[in-house]
Design a protein with these regions (language model features):
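Nucleotide and nucleotide-moiety/phosphate-recognizing core
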Residues: 3-118, 129-144, 150-163, 174-209
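Phosphate- and other anionic-substrate recognition elements at nucleic-acid/protein interfaces
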Residues: 122
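Intrinsically disordered, low-complexity regions enriched in acidic/Ser/Thr/Pro/Gln residues
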Residues: 165-168
Length: 212
């Protein structure tokens, strides 16, 4: 009983932020790896380096602000197997899923549009689909960042979608996303049990065009 209490106390003032994507240098700037770019931005801002943690199947970094610890994870698994890493992280830290934030790309949202959901289906996203399967629940926070739709190609929609998500973020898109990352980081740091509804509402109504 004491051990359980200690674990709950230890991690109540922490946030676990996991980005989904594909490992390997050739994928780093892909639209599918938009969460990777966010965590890179996060770690550079707070001067925290990533190291590989094999038991967690992830690259890991952490930093503290006002006695609050932020644990950042970049799974070393491919997108379709994201659940293996997320399950390993959840089991190792024995965390409450309220403290878990999954960052993913969303092809159905305009570039830079944010959608924060506390639960829900995968929406056709293979990474989320695998996490739901491995955790056996849809009740976890996910923050979707829009990457925009691919140009219309009626002859081969599937191939068109794949080439879009695996295509690199352009320099123009990066300017928009930098502002989105800044807003997201500020919001994740401010987020607490008392202001949660307000922060989520603010993120979901954030207009990236107005901040260009």
């Amino acid at each position: 009983y004491m051990f359980t209490y200690k674990v709950e106390f230890m991690y109540s003032n922490e946030k676990f932020i996991i980005r989904l994507g594909n490992p390997g240098k050739e994928y780093i700037k892909n639209r599918h790896n938009i969460g990777f770019l966010l965590l890179e931005y996060f770690s550079e801002k707070y001067d925290s380096k990533f190291t590989l943690k094999n038991k967690l199947k992830s690259w890991y970094s952490e930093f503290k602000i006002n006695n609050f610890t932020y644990r950042l994870f970049m799974p070393n698994t491919f997108m379709n197997n994201s659940g293996n890493a997320v399950r390993a992280i959840v089991d190792w830290y024995k965390i409450d899923l309220d403290r878990l934030f999954i960052i993913v790309d969303d092809i159905d949202l305009p570039l830079g549009k944010i959608r924060f959901r506390k639960k829900g289906s995968s929406g056709g996203h293979n990474g989320l689909k695998d996490i739901i399967k491995k955790l056996q629940t849809e009740n976890f926070n996910r923050i979707k960042i829009g990457i925009g739709s691919p140009p219309v190609n009626e002859r081969n929609k599937t191939l068109n979608t794949i080439s879009h998500v695996l295509g690199n973020v352009s320099s123009k898109e990066s300017l928009t996303l930098d502002r989105v990352y800044k807003k997201l980081i500020e919001s994740l740091i401010e987020l607490n049990d008392k202001n949660e509804d307000y922060i989520i509402s603010e993120l979901n109504s954030f207009h990236r065009e107005e901040n260009l």
